[in-house]
């Protein structure tokens, strides 16, 4: 049974992708992370030794801290945050518990490098249609809640990507775009391992509206 400062895997999974999803912080040590370099959707990785430095950014938000098994690292980190005025819980069973429940996990290698502010930066064509609206929604809800999106003239997408260290998407000739009959939203689902009944249904709607 979860303690008053724990949240179960099932409870957290129901919040993922919703406006009520807490900020999720992964504090696994390097060996545990290297053994499974994937994150719970929307999670960000930080060292337990630096947890207090996150306080200002986390004030007023609900936080869930996860380590390998939900023991010393997450419980100690969450306790520090609570002492500093942050509403913080730990994930019961930690990363291992999430994996055992066979829930989606995002491969870190697929996430673009973050800027100095800790945000991924993406760029695409201005005047977005459904695919270029759905993709930012997906990224902010399931990959990087603080992601930055730049909408520029079509002819300047790749130039902006180069000069602003942004990742281009939904244009011809780039990785994060249409693949055969699939739209860009499908590519994000595939690469980030985010398939679920709900997101697959949404992908069908996006694909139908985008390719007709």
What positions do the PLM features span?
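Rhodanese-like catalytic fold shared by cysteine-dependent sulfurtransferases
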Residues: 1-23, 27-64, 69-130, 135-136, ...
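A short beta-strand-loop structural module common to alpha/beta enzyme folds
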Residues: 27, 148-158
